Structures are given as structure tokens and as C-alpha cells.
Amino acid sequence: MEENSATTLEKIQEAALAEFLKKGFLGASLRQIVKNAGVTTGAFYGYFSSKEALFTAIVEPHASMLMSRFMEAQTTFADLPEEEQPKHMGVESRDHVAWMVGYICQHREPVKLLLCCAEGTSYEHFVHNMVEVEVEYTLRYMGVLRRMGRDIPQMSRSLCHIIASGMFNAIFEVVIHDMPYEQAPRDVEQLQAFYTAGWSKLMGE
């Protein structure tokens, strides 16, 4: 019984993944998912209360992992003594982005759902929310540098948002455009070098 139950659940999730990837959450048909899974509507509702509950079951583990590791990286850095933060800046950022690239490459399809197919769900602003966190911690770090006597030019929150948004969306292109895993780390490493040089220029370094 348990084996049959697990098989039914897997069939529903596999059919849903294909349907959501093809049509997005809003365009996906619950009837088509049930049909493609080869189960009854009653069997479906034995596992999920709605189409959104099904989408959440597929996406949430990955959204949670990406956001929690991202927040951990931000708070770990911010909790360092201020005088130690500058020397850790590049290392912390590179390590986290390298982990993120590996993770999204290992979980391409559900991550692609999260990034490309979530309109109409609570996940549709996922990248925007990450960007807002990045902006907040960037502005805090600028404050740290100023307190240390660095002459950091004033930069608007909107500019910081544009820069951070460009960076995150560029990293996620790895999944959106099915970049080969062998190529992704190198491309993202060069992307980081590009953004690091830009930030250095803006900060007068």
C-alpha cells in the first residue's frame, strides 16, 4: 500500500512538473495533470488540496534552501567585526555563489519552475525578494566602510537595486537557458569579476 501510494504521488508530481514547465502555473491544467499522471481526481485530492498546493510541494524545498543559504551568508558576514568585513567580502560572496550555481544546476527543473513559471503563486517575486535583501545588506556594508573612514560616494537605493537585480538574474540564466554544468561555474566566476570591478569603480577604489 505504501509503495503504491508513493508511486501515485511520484506520478502526480512528475506530470505536474512537465505541465507547469510547459504552460506556467496559470496556464497549467489540473485536469491535464491528473490525466497525464494516470490517476483519478479523487486520488489527486488525497494528496493535494489545489493546483497551488501541488506547485508549492514541488518548489518550496528549493525556494527554502536557496533563500535560507542566502540569508545565512548575508547574516554571517554582517555579524563579523566591522574591521574584518572588508577582507572577507570577496571570499564570502564567491563561496556562496559557487554553492548556489552548483545547487541550481543539480535541481534545474524545479528551480526553473521557481524562476520562470511561478506567476500567480506566492513565489512570483522570489528573485525580487532576494534582490531587496542584497540591497539592504549592501547599504549596511557601505555604512561600515564609511565608519572605518573610507570615502564612499552616496549611491541611491534604486541604483543598488538595479545592479543587484542584474547580477541575480544573470546568475539564474544558468538554469533559464539550460547552460551546461561544465560551463556554468566559469561563466559565473567571470560575471562576478565583472561586477566586482564595477563596484570597485563606483566606490572609488
What do the PLM-derived regions correspond to, one by one?
Residues 112-114:
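Short, hydrophobic secondary-structure boundary micro-motifs
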Residues 91, 99-103, 121-147, 158-165:
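Amphipathic alpha-helical packing segments from all-alpha helical-bundle domains
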Residues 1-4:
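N-terminal intrinsically disordered/low-complexity leader segments
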